[in-house]
Structure formats: C-alpha cells, structure tokens
A protein has these predicted regions:
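A glycosyltransferase accessory/donor-loop signature
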Residues: 1-6, 11-13, 17-23, 39, ...
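Short, acidic, metal-binding catalytic loop of nucleotide-sugar glycosyltransferases
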Residues: 27-34
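A residue-level signal for conserved active-site and pocket-lining positions in enzyme catalytic cores
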Residues: 28, 104, 118, 170, ...
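Residues at the starts of beta-strands that form the adenosine-phosphate
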Residues: 36-37, 111
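Short, polar loop motifs at secondary-structure junctions
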Residues: 41-47, 66-67, 120-124
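Active-site-proximal specificity loops/subdomain of glycosyltransferases
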Residues: 46-107
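GT-A fold catalytic core of metal-dependent nucleotide-sugar glycosyltransferases
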Residues: 96-148
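Conserved catalytic core of nucleotide-sugar-dependent glycosyltransferases
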Residues: 127-191
Length: 286
C-alpha cells in the first residue's frame, strides 16, 4: 500500500494508496448519498489504519493478502511493477492490482461501485448507477482533460482484436451475470500468457482493464453490438505527464515551456501519483 520511488534528480516520491483511499472516502461521504465505503487492503494496510487511528473513515475493511496462482504475468508473481511518468520524470512503482477479480466475493453490498483509489470523487454522478437495471457497467470511453489524446494508451487490446474497457470504475450487483464476469476475469488472470497470445497483447504485467475487456467480450457472446455494459459517461482522467496544481487545474511541459489549464470540478482519475498524493493531503487536511 506504500512505496517510495526516486526521480531523475534523486528526490524521493512517497506513494500511499491507503491515504488516497481515506481521501476518497471523505469525498464520497461528502458528495454522494450512496456513501457506504468498503476498503480492500492487505494486513499491512489495516495495521497502518489502526496505528494512525483512521479505521473510522471506512464502513468495512476487508483484508486480502497477496496471492497468485497460474503462469505469468511477471517473473515475480506477487509484485507487479509499472513505469509511470511523474511530470517530466519516469518512475517505477510496485503495482498491486491482482485482487480486483475477487471483488464480487469480497464486497459486502448488493450493489457495488468498484473504484481505483486514485479516482477522486468530486460530484454525485455515480449515484445514478444505483438507479439502473443493469447488473454490470464499466468504462467504455475515456477523456483526457488536457486534450492530449495520445496520452491514453488503448482503444483496443490490439488493433486486430477487441474493444478496450476500463476497470477504473466498475458497477456490479450481486447477480449471476456479475458473478460470471468476475469468474472470467479470474480465469484470464490465472492464464495470462494464454490470453495474451489469443488476444494479441504483449503486456507481461497483469492488467485488470485487459481482463475486464475479455470478460465483457465473452458476456456479449463475442459481438460488439449484442449488449451494452457501458457507463453512461466518460471516465475523465489526467495523464501522468500532467502535474496537478489544485483539484481542478494542471500544468505540463510543452517543448521548452510549461502550459496548463483548469477544468470544471468533476470526478477524475489522477494518473500522476505524486499529484494524487497532494490531492489526498489537501482533502485529508480539510
């Protein structure tokens, strides 16, 4: 839940996903009416919450320690790592993302919205999902607020294969359909190398977005027009090339100069982890 990376000038960057989750819980309870929050973390994460006296921010805390079975996705089957930009620097961070396919059995709720801890909730649009008749909804469209479309990695897993869906925001109910989705995701995770060859992606690092995309493809009877599982809005993100200067403003390097802008306050996935930490500090400190 906590890691330290070093930038090109040898300064350190502490990334604490528990602190991001605390900030998000505060925001969810501030902006949403459906605001029960369950945190899934490992034993160290819960110990941190207890030591900091921060358990009260969550209605439930579910402990799941790292586990992995199957071939791939990495030489190290416990810790994924991923290179991420931090403005003009590149850092490599541990990437603990392999418990997401277990969310169906871990959730204590009949209706759940599964969020990345760095997807910050600044409005109530997610409340609308609880009023739908769908059993599964996820991100099909992503918008990058700086309008640098090349910063978004994929529209398809491979140009010859299937449409990309994003696991950043995933709504599901306790239903046969949702349970099947997560079973397929677990199968993809366990057999990562096989599915990589089948769907022509080269990622050695396990990605929930890819596993979700394959599961949606199968639920749709392998047809892109058979049934929709798409959220009724874009997932807005700020790419890691951008540095957030407030909750709704950013700057980025353009040639030899810096440029930037602000945007309407809204839910946003902050991919620059140092910026996500700074937002978390602002929220937690009032």
């Amino acid at each position: 839940f906590n890691s330290v990376a070093h930038t090109s000038d040898n300064s350190s960057v502490e990334i604490n996903y528990i602190k991001m989750a605390i900030a998000n819980s505060i925001l969810i309870k501030r902006h949403m009416k459906n605001n029960q929050v369950c945190l899934v973390t490992d034993s160290n994460g819960k110990k941190y919450l207890e030591k900091q006296d921060k358990l009260y921010h969550f209605d439930h805390v579910v402990v799941q320690d790292k586990q992995y079975k199957g071939k791939g996705p990495n030489d190290n089957l416990v810790v994924n790592t991923r290179a991420m930009r931090n403005g003009t620097d590149t850092i490599r961070l541990p990437w603990q993302n392999q418990s997401r396919p277990d969310a169906y059995k871990l959730s204590p709720y009949d209706k759940t919205i599964l969020l990345d801890s760095d997807y910050f909730v600044f409005d109530d649009i997610l409340d609308k999902l609880f009023d739908t008749d769908y059993n599964v909804l996820c991100g099909a469209h992503v918008g990058e607020v700086s309008q640098q479309g090349t910063l978004i990695d994929y529209k398809r897993l491979h140009h010859q294969t299937i449409k990309m869906y994003w696991a950043t925001v995933l709504y599901f109910t306790k239903s046969y359909e949702a349970e099947l989705l997560f079973k397929i995701m677990n199968s993809v995770k366990t057999n990562w190398q096989y599915y990589g060859k089948l769907y022509k992606f080269a990622s050695k690092t396990y990605r929930n977005d890819f596993a979700l995309s394959i599961a949606i493809h199968m639920l749709r009877a392998k047809q892109e027009v058979f049934k929709t599982y798409e959220l009724p809005f874009k997932i807005m993100c700020v790419a890691d090339k951008n540095i957030m200067t407030s909750n709704n403003a950013f700057v980025f390097r353009k040639g030899d100069t810096w440029a930037g802008s602000s945007f309407p306050t809204q839910n946003v996935h902050v991919m620059n982890k140092q910026s996500a930490m700074e937002i978390s500090e602002r929220v937690c400190n009032g």
